[in-house]
Amino acid sequence: MNIIQQLEAEQAARLSETKTIPEFQPGDTVIVNVKVVEGERTRVQAYEGVCIARNGGGLNENFVVRKISYGEGVERVFPIYSPLIDSIKVVRRGKVRRAKLYYLRDRRGKSARIAERTDDRAKKAKATAAE
């Protein structure tokens, strides 16, 4: 491991102590709470949409969230370790077979829907652990 990788690993460990980042993949619907600065005040704004891509790795990892706002598609790129991100919450898991869901940009209505992923193995594991 070279020095840069070691420094990035230390930084990632330090940043993940203060903030928990859930595991999510493209296709998952997420709520990203973003800190917005307006003059003197800061407030938290929720941005809910479908994660359509994850890029990069380590400290430089980004994810793209797409939502439809007033009939217009809006995409926003968030760095995972950004100090402006207050929290990330996964609302539902999507069942997709691609890493990049850029084809959703051309789709409207029902064709833009993503089926929900049901993890039967995870449910069975929780049920056996509860017994």
Swiss-Prot record:
Residues 110-131 are annotated as: Disordered. Keywords: Ribonucleoprotein, Ribosomal protein. It comes from the Bacteria. One of its GO terms (cellular component) is cytosolic large ribosomal subunit. This protein is located at the 30S-50S ribosomal subunit interface and may play a role in the structure and function of the aminoacyl-tRNA binding site. InterPro entries: Ribosomal_bL19, Ribosomal_bL19_CS, Ribosomal_bL19_sf, Translation_prot_SH3-like_sf. One of its GO terms (molecular function) is structural constituent of ribosome. Belongs to the bacterial ribosomal protein bL19 family. GO terms for biological process: translation. Residues 113-122 have a biased composition (Basic and acidic residues). Pfam families: Ribosomal_L19. This is Large ribosomal subunit protein bL19.
